[in-house]
UniProtKB/Swiss-Prot annotation:
Identification of the protein by name: MEMO1 family protein TM_0087
InterPro entries reported for this sequence: MEMO1_fam (IPR002737)
PANTHER family recorded: PROTEIN MEMO1
Family (UniProt): Belongs to the MEMO1 family.
Domain of life, per lineage: Bacteria
Pfam families: Memo (PF01875)
Signal sequence bounds: none
Length: 277
């Protein structure tokens, strides 16, 4: 089954040439973006890496997202890319994995890695084959044009989380460890924005707690801060999955808010790019 884009023309341009140019500008942005384009991919990814990557409209979060993809290129071309995104629509299964076929963007199609999907499904107590959770969801889709831009051809495992509980994060981390055994060069993207629709000062404070938990690679602290500080982070389950894995290092690459882009600091959304390896 081919998944058609749900948010082309909304979150990013629907025309190929315009999309390529906007992604280029995300990388070349010197104020919030990294200010340079990624170099050529010179090697194969040898060990798993994780990215925390935002998923708003490219005009707002694209320059922050560019930091993560720029860094990922330095590690090498992945054998498969797992993209874990939160379910914003309420449709589908609690943990829905798109099982087969391909996903289309204005830059072309990317195949679903059916062998990798099989490994995840057979080693998870929660993950289920599901199309419905993905049909209208944007959080996974918006990562794919960036992947196509920096790597060209990749295969993916799309996982959409309505259930973002600690139990699911631990379960998925365990299933992904099995995947790593067969696909050592896996890139795992946790698609998330941070605090939503509060003023700049409040969002910077709340986001700092999330960054602290990520830097400490502490999933329990992440969940504690979410509740204690009332943080409206949308994709915490994917981030907690990364924090439950056996990564040894983490680097915070960039944090900004929508207010840094628009100048409106009354109601902002926080964006973070980080890499785990």
């Amino acid at each position: 089954m081919k998944r058609k884009p749900a948010v082309a023309g909304l979150f990013y341009p629907s025309r190929r040439d315009e999309l390529i140019e906007q992604i280029r500008m995300c990388f070349l942005d010197k104020r919030i973006g990294p200010g340079k384009l990624p170099g050529p991919v010179e090697t194969k990814l040898q060990n798993p890496i994780g990215l925390v990557s935002p998923h708003a409209g490219y005009i707002y979060s694209g320059p922050v997202a560019a930091w993560g993809f720029l860094e990922a290129v330095k590690f090498g071309e992945p054998s498969v890319v797992v993209i874990i995104g939160p379910n914003h629509t309420g449709l589908g299964r609690p943990v829905g994995v798109w099982p087969e076929g391909e996903w289309e963007t204005p830059l072309g199609t990317v195949p679903v890695n059916e062998r990798a999907v099989e490994i995840v499904l057979s080693n998870s107590r929660y993950a289920e084959e599901d199309f419905m959770s993905h049909i209208r969801e944007h959080s996974i889709e918006v990562q794919i044009p960036f992947l196509q831009f920096v790597f060209g051809e990749v295969s993916i495992v799309p996982i959409c989380l309505m259930d973002q509980s600690p139990a699911v994060a631990e379960d998925l981390a365990s299933a992904l460890a099995k995947l790593v055994a067969e696909f050592p060069g896996v890139l795992i993207i946790a698609s998330t924005d941070l605090n939503h629709y509060e003023d700049q000062r409040t969002t910077l404070r709340k986001d700092s707690y999330i960054i602290e938990a990520i830097e400490g690679m502490d999933p329990s602290l992440l969940y504690e801060y979410l509740v204690r500080e009332d943080i409206s982070m949308c994709g915490y389950g994917g981030v907690a999955t990364l924090l439950n894995m056996d990564f040894e290092n983490v680097r915070i690459l960039k944090h900004a808010t929508s207010g840094d882009v628009s100048g409106d600091t009354l109601e902002v959304v926080g964006y973070l790019s980080a890499i785990l390896f």
